[in-house]
Regions:
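Extracytoplasmic gate region of multi-pass secondary transporters
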Residues: 42, 221-260
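Central cavity-lining transmembrane alpha-helices of secondary-active solute carriers
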Residues: 64-77, 260-269
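Conserved MFS/SLC helix-loop-helix module at the cytosolic interface between two early adjacent transmembrane helices
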Residues: 72-107
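Helix-to-loop junctions at the C-terminal end of transmembrane segments
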Residues: 73-84, 269-281, 366
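Cytoplasmic helix-loop-helix junction between adjacent transmembrane helices
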Residues: 117-152
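Helix-loop-helix hairpin linking two adjacent transmembrane segments in secondary transporters
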Residues: 150-196
Length: 400
C-alpha cells in the first residue's frame, strides 16, 4: 500500500502524526491570510490617516484603544479551550473576513477602528485554536518545528499577503486592499471547515476541568518578555511606512516593495527557527532573536537618513523579532500544559499591552522626533525582553 504524501512531509518526518502532516499546510495557509489582514494597516497608516483627515498620532491613539480592548485575551483563551479546534479555527477565519469588510467600508475612523479590533479578536480565536491543535497532536520536544512551520505564515502574510493587498491599494485605494484580504480569508475559512475532522479534539471534560489551573508565577516572566518583544516590534512597524514616505518619498507601491523584502527577511527567520529552536533550546533561541533587535535599533537611530543602511537595519530588526516570537510561542503554550489556550492567552495579553503602548508612543514619538526615537525605544524594549527570559530561566528547574 502506497503511503499518502503530504506537502508538510518535506519538513516533518514519520515521527509526527499523520493528522499533523495532513493538515498543517492548510492551517498555515489559513493563518497566512489572517496575518495579511492583521498586518495590512501599519505600513499604510499614512494613507489611511490622510483618507480620514487625521494625524498619524491620532490614528495611533485609536489603534491603542483597540489593543487595550484586547486585554480580554485570557478570557478568550479559556473560551477557545472549550471549543472544537475546527470550530475555533474556521470560525475565527470567517469572523476575520467579516471584520476586514467592516474596515474596508468604514465611513469614519472609529468604524475603521472597530473593524481592526474585530480582526484582532477573531485572529486571536484562530491563533489560540491553532496553538491548542498543535499541543493536542505534537509532543512538546518536537513542537518547535511544527510551530515554526505554522509561524512562517506571519512572514508570508507580509511577504505575499500584505504585498498583494498593497499593490491593489496603490492601483485603487487602501479599502480595496482590505476587500481582497477579506475574500482570501473567507475562502480559507471554508477550506478549514470542510477539511478538518469535525470530531477533532474539543473542549472535552478534561479541558473544562483543567482550565481552572493557575499560571505558575515564573510564567509571568514570559508575560513580561512578550510585552517587551511586541512593544519593540510595534514601535517600528507603525512608523516605518511614514518614515519611508516622509524621508525618501516612497509611494504605496514602493512601500509594498519594501514590505515584500521585509517579509523575505522574516521568512528566513521563521524557517531557521523552525529548524533550530528545538536543538538550540527555546529560551536561548528567543534571546538570540532579541540580540539582533538591540543593535539594529541602536544603529537605526543614527543611520536613518541613509536609505540603504536604514532598510538593511530595519530588515535585521524584524528578522530578530520573527526569530524570537517563533521560539517563544511553544514556550508560552506549555506554561499551563493541561490548558494551553489559557496559558498562551495570558502571555499574548502581555503582547497586546506592548503593542497598545507603542501604538500611541511610537506614532507620537515619530510625529515629534522622526524614526530615530522609536528605533531607540525598540532597542530598549529588546533589552527588557532579554532580561525577562534570563529571569525565567533562573526560576525554572528544567529548560527545554
Amino acid at each position: 500500500m502506497t503511503k499518502e504524501k503530504y506537502l508538510a512531509d518535506r519538513f516533518l518526518d514519520d515521527t509526527y502524526s499523520e493528522e499533523t502532516r495532513r493538515h498543517v499546510s492548510t492551517l498555515t495557509i489559513g493563518r497566512l491570510t489572517s496575518n495579511a489582514c492583521f498586518r495590512y494597516a501599519p505600513p499604510f497608516l499614512a494613507s489611511i490617516s490622510d483618507d480620514f483627515n487625521i494625524s498619524l498620532s491620532r490614528l495611533g491613539l485609536a489603534l491603542m484603544v483597540t489593543e487595550i480592548a484586547m486585554g480580554i485575551s485570557p478570557l478568550l483563551g479559556r473560551f477557545v479551550d472549550r471549543l472544537h479546534r475546527r470550530t475555533a479555527m474556521a470560525g475565527g477565519l470567517l469572523a476575520i473576513s467579516g471584520a476586514a469588510t467592516i474596515a474596508a467600508a468604514s465611513p469614519s475612523v472609529w468604524i475603521f477602528v472597530l473593524g481592526i479590533l474585530l480582526i484582532a479578536v477573531a485572529k486571536f480565536i484562530f491563533d489560540i485554536g491553532l496553538a491548542s491543535w498543535v499541543n493536542d497532536h505534537v509532543e512538546y520536544e518536537k513542537r518547535g518545528r511544527v510551530i515554526g512551520l505554522t509561524e512562517t505564515s506571519w512572514a508570508l502574510g507580509l511577504l505575499v499577503g500584505v504585498t498583494a493587498m498593497g499593490l491593489v491599494a496603490s492601483a485603487t485605494s487602501w479599502r480595496w486592499g482590505y476587500a481582497v484580504g477579506a475574500l482570501s480569508v473567507a475562502i480559507m475559512g471554508l477550506v478549514v471547515m470542510t477539511r478538518l475532522d469535525g470530531h477533532d479534539v474539543a473542549g472535552s471534560q478534561r479541558s473544562r476541568d483543567t482550565v481552572k489551573h493557575k499560571m505558575p508565577l515564573n510564567g509571568y516572566w514570559i508575560f513580561g518578555a512578550m510585552f517587551f518583544l511586541m512593544a519593540a516590534s510595534q514601535t517600528l512597524f507603525v512608523t516605518f511606512g511614514s518614515w519611508l514616505e516622509d524621508e525618501f518619498g516612497f509611494t504605496e507601491a514602493g512601500i509594498s516593495a519594501v514590505v515584500f523584502g521585509l517579509g523575505a527577511f522574516e521568512l528566513l527567520a521563521s524557517v531557521t527557527s523552525a529548524r533550530r529552536t528545538d536543538t538550540w533550546g527555546k529560551e536561548r533561541s528567543t534571546i538570540f532573536g532579541a540580540a539582533l533587535i538591540l543593535p539594529a535599533g541602536l544603529l537605526l537611530t543614527v543611520g536613518h537618513n541613509n536609505q540603504v543602511v536604514g532598510l538593511i537595519l530595519l530588515g535585521i530588526y524584524l528578522l530578530g523579532f520573527e526569530f524570537s516570537i517563533v521560539s517563544m510561542l511553544p514556550l508560552s503554550a506549555n506554561l499551563i500544559p493541561s490548558s494551553p489556550g489559557r496559558g498562551l492567552g495570558i502571555v499574548l495579553a502581555g503582547g497586546t499591552l506592548g503593542r497598545a503602548s507603542m501604538s500611541l508612543i511610537g506614532t507620537a514619538a515619530y510625529d515629534k522626533f522622526g524614526i530615530n526615537v522609536p528605533a531607540f525605544i525598540g532597542a530598549i524594549c529588546a533589552a527588557g525582553m532579554i532580561g525577562c527570559i534570563v529571569a525565567y530561566g533562573r526560576t525554572t528547574p528544567s529548560n527545554v
